[in-house]
Amino acid sequence: MLKGFAWIISVGNELLIGRVVNTNAAWLAAKLTYLGYAVRRIVVVPDEENEIVEAFRDAMERSDVVISTGGLGPTPDDITNLAFCKALGVEAEVNEEALRMVREKYESRGYPMTPEREKMAKMPPGAVPLPNPVGTAPGILYQRGDKVVVLLPGVPREMEAIFENSVEPLLKSRGPPVYFSEKVVVVRGVPEADIAPILKEVMKIDPRLYVKSHPKGFEVGAPLLHIHIYASAGSEEEAQGLVKKVAERLVELLKSRPGAEVSTS
């Protein structure tokens, strides 16, 4: 059961050269999943206008929700908001509410407004600035028809704060409620290749089910697997019931394998 498809666009050269680990994308993917959205792409692009424009256009064409991180600050390579306007085919304009937010942040610390700082208030006509409680650059919310696009800063604590305060309530309110449940089954002594038929069997139980094995030991010698079970449904009870049913069947099948040691968490 899903509310729609989502894309995550991560902007920044630092991500592509391996200097910064993309923890923002992992955090957002988990949030979106538990809100009922299937994340179909995580795209990382450099601080280059044409790359960012192409990513936004592609994402808006193929998904219901698009969330970008990075490129909203005052430096020359912070161009995500301007590139997004170009992707829409509109001129960027200074949003007065966003300008007020930025001005208050700087003036409260004794810093004057500059053209570079004013740039952080530029966004497409009709966009809504999202308050940044822990930083200076506001987020940007843009809706066109049933599409939702959100631009967030790249600093993790700023991104998380804006998402939880302003974005999560909006996404949660769209469509019917979706509930997730999960469980981990730990199995020792059975190679991953040997349990593939078992996983294939239990995944047929319900289309709302996702089962994935994660090797933690050595395939030959000391196999150790964590098998994650996820399910979504229209109620918490239904999701939990489905996971319980699948976990019990999985444990039963795994214990039939010689040498298997099985536990759940």
From Swiss-Prot:
Name the SMART domains for this protein: MoCF_biosynth
The domain of life for this entry's organism is Archaea
Signal sequence span per UniProt?
A: none
SUPFAM superfamilies annotated for this entry? Answer: Molybdenum cofactor biosynthesis proteins (SSF53218)
Pfam families named among the record's database cross-references: MoCF_biosynth
What family is this? Belongs to the CinA family.
Under the heading HAMAP family, the entry gives: CinA_A (MF_00226_A)
| UniProt protein name | Protein Pars_0096
Q: What organism, scientifically named, is this protein from?
A: Pyrobaculum arsenaticum (strain DSM 13514 / JCM 11321 / PZ6)
Q: What is the lineage of its organism?
A: Archaea, Thermoproteota, Thermoprotei, Thermoproteales, Thermoproteaceae
